[in-house]
C-alpha cells in the first residue's frame, strides 16, 4: 500500500524541521537574493519569443516556507497557487501573505501527486528541489505536466549526482552510524563535518550551500528521510516520461564546453548536444540541475 504523502517520512520531517529558513523581511531578502525560476526576471528563458506577461497563472509545487510568497510579491498581477505537504511551511506563507497583503496568493496543503484535484491549469509550474524527495518522482512530474496550458512551462530543480558526491558519501556515513533526525544525531553531524579535511569532496559543496549554516538545512542535506540525485540522462528520461519536450538548462554553464581551441573541448563540441551535456556534467560536477 502506498504511504499517504501527507503523513509519510518526508512530511513528518518538514513538520519538525521547517525548511528553508523562513524569511521575515521580503524586501530585505530580495535586496540581495533571487528565487529560482521567478518569471519577473527569468521569463525570457522560458518564453524567448515573447515579453513578460504580468497576469500569468503560476503553481509553486512544494513551496516550502517562502518561495510562493516571493513569487506573489515580485509578480503582483500574477495568480500564484502554492501547494506543500508541510503545514508549518504553509503557516509561514500565511504569515507573509498577511504581512504583505499578497491577495494573489492561494495556499493548499496538498501533495504533488494530487495536484490535479485543484482543477486548474497554469502558464508556469515551478518545483524547486522537491520531486527528488517523492516516493516516485516520475509520478510527480506527470502530475505537474498535466496541469500545463498548451504553451506552459514546467521548471524543475533536481539534485545533480556528480556535484553531490561528497553529500552522498556523508549521508552513507550517517546511515551507517544509525543517526536519525534528533538533536543528538545533529550534534554528531556537525562535529563530523567540522572534522573533515580540506581535500574532502564535501568541501566544494559546502562553499555553495548556505543551508548548512542552520539546523534544518543540515537535516535536509545529510539526514533526509528520502532523496535521490539525477544525471543528465535521468533528467531527460523524466521529461520524456512526463510527455514533455526538454527546452533548456536554467544554469547552462555547467553543461556546455567552453569556446576554446583545446583538443578536448573540440572533441566534446563535436558530440551530439545531449552527449555534450552528459560529458560536461562529469567535468564540472554541478550540484543542481
Place the predicted regions along the sequence by residue.
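Conserved alpha-helix/loop element of class I SAM-dependent methyltransferases that forms part
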Residues: 16, 21-56
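Class I SAM-dependent methyltransferase SAM/SAH-binding core
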Residues: 57-59, 66-114
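A short acidic, Gly/Pro-enriched loop at the edge of an enzyme's catalytic core
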Residues: 116-124
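A short SAM/SAH-binding and catalytic strip from SAM-dependent methyltransferases
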Residues: 123-136
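A short glycine-rich, Lys/Arg-flanked "PGG" loop and its adjoining helix->strand segment in the class I
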Residues: 138-150
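Conserved class I S-adenosyl-L-methionine
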Residues: 153-204
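Short alpha-helix
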Residues: 228-246
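Conserved small/polar residues in nucleotide/adenosyl-binding loops
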Residues: 289
Amino acid at each position: 500500500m502506498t504511504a499517504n504523502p501527507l503523513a509519510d517520512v518526508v512530511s513528518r520531517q518538514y513538520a519538525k524541521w521547517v525548511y528553508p529558513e523562513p524569511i521575515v523581511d521580503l524586501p530585505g531578502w530580495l535586496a540581495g537574493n533571487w528565487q529560482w525560476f521567478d518569471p519577473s526576471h527569468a521569463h525570457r528563458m522560458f518564453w524567448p519569443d515573447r515579453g513578460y506577461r504580468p497576469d500569468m497563472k503560476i503553481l509553486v509545487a512544494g513551496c516550502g516556507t517562502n518561495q510562493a510568497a516571493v513569487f506573489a510579491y515580485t509578480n503582483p498581477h500574477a495568480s500564484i497557487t502554492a501547494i506543500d505537504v508541510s503545514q508549518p511551511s504553509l503557516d509561514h506563507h500565511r504569515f507573509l501573505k498577511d504581512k504583505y497583503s499578497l491577495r494573489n496568493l492561494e495556499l493548499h496543503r496538498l501533495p504533488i501527486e494530487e495536484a490535479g484535484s485543484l482543477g486548474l491549469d497554469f502558464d508556469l509550474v515551478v518545483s524547486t528541489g522537491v520531486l527528488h524527495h517523492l516516493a516516485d518522482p516520475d509520478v510527480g512530474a506527470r502530475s505537474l505536466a498535466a496541469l500545463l496550458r498548451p504553451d506552459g512551462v514546467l521548471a524543475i530543480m533536481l539534485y545533480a549526482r556528480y556535484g553531490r558526491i561528497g553529500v552522498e558519501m556523508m549521508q552513507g556515513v550517517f546511515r551507517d552510524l544509525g543517526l536519525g533526525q534528533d538533536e543528538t544525531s545533529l550534534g554528531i553531524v556537525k562535529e563530523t563535518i567540522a572534522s573533515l579535511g580540506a581535500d574532502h569532496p564535501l568541501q566544494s559543496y559546502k562553499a555553495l550551500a548556505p543551508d548548512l549554516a542552520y539546523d534544518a538545512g543540515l537535516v535536509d542535506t545529510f539526514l533526509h528521510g528520502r532523496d535521490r540525485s539525477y544525471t543528465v540522462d535521468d533528467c531527460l528520461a523524466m521529461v520524456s516520461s512526463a510527455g514533455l519536450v526538454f527546452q533548456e538548462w536554467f544554469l547552462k554553464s555547467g553543461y556546455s564546453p567552453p569556446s576554446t581551441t583545446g583538443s578536448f573541448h573540440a572533441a566534446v563540441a563535436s558530440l551530439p548536444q545531449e552527449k555534450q551535456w552528459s560529458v560536461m556534467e562529469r567535468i564540472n560536477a554541478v550540484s543542481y540541475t
